[in-house]
Amino acid sequence: ACLEPSMCAEMACQSAHKMATSETFSGLSPPASGATNIMFDPTEHPHRRYNPLQDSWVLVSPHRARRPWQGQQENVDDTPRPSHDPSCYLCPGNTRIGGEVNPDYTQPYVFPNDFPALLPDTPEYRSDDPLLKSMAVRGTARVICFSPDHGKTLPELPPAVIETIIATWIQQYRELGERWRWVQIFENKGAAMGCSNPHPHGQVWASDFLPNEVARADDSQRRYFQANGRSLLLDYVERELKERSRIVVEGEHWLAVVPYWAVWPFETLLMPKAALPRLMDATPEQQKDLAIVLKKLTSRYDNLFHTSFPYSMGWHGAPFGQEDTAHWQCHAHFYPPLLRSATVKKFMVGYEMLAESQRDLTAEQAAERLRALPEVHYREAADR
């Protein structure tokens, strides 16, 4: 028993301080550097940011943006391409690698991928071995040629043509969603992203399972909705509209931002301003506005370094075959690798592969640079 309450309190305080000191130097909480009078500045000091969609963190190191670069540089060929290339497997009227002849299409053209990653008739198989677990999967894969023009990428197409691409995406969702649980629409633009053919095109992969990224996004949005009674991404849109420091393009119905938790240098997240679980639920007005926003966003990308800006982009929305979709909000991710110029890209290696994602430029700095650029494509501006 303690005879003096004040002494007991002092002893307890000393004990707590000793425990805290022990924890500090055992690595649980690193000791302060001693610079206690320096205020934290997110534009100068390293910090972590949380991605609520993926339940993951990214290390932000803005002080590293000044480091010199003597590493690999990309080869850039920005020579304008012809509207039709006789040797291209995707141009109208040409023969594809498998021997099929493309029609003389004038709108977006969809055909089965000649080298699909998924097959619809895979035999049943499942192993529940705790160390060697596996399962057979089924699916299908298609290619979408955006237009017959071999030389014009998405930002160089007029909004009316981009609307036909959006309509094609929606048609693919409706058709493939009747059978498959997940339909992934995406585009790999540019050789830096592994694009195997320069003719502007995207892909559709449909599967009977939820891929990892989607499963995590589904779980995160569901948990947020259950805890708050609201959509995670709708709340996030409201926050971005209020703060405005990360907005790149704003339309009547759509908003493109560099997300607070961005990993890639000029990564963007494209979201509707109103509840929209799937892109296929978009109204004609929303589709029209989306075409305008897509053109403005991708034009800013190209204008950043006056080059055809490489990226991987793709759409996420509520999976098919489930009635519970209130927690979902459709959105598109743009993941571009370029960092300092048209020839220097970010590499996901070392720490990023072994520990966690890391970036130098803050999301706010990246958004400011993109936002300040003209929304008219540099080639269109030169032709005026």
Residue ranges of each PLM-predicted region?
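Extended C-terminal subregions enriched in glycine
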Residues: 289-308, 312
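Double-stranded beta-helix
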Residues: 237-238, 275-296
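Short intrinsically disordered, low-complexity coil segments enriched in acidic
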Residues: 1-4, 67
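Active-site microenvironments that recognize anionic phosphate/pyrophosphate groups
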Residues: 23-28, 32-199, 205-277, 299, ...
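Linear-motif-rich, low-complexity cytosolic tails and juxtamembrane regions
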Residues: 12, 16, 96-97
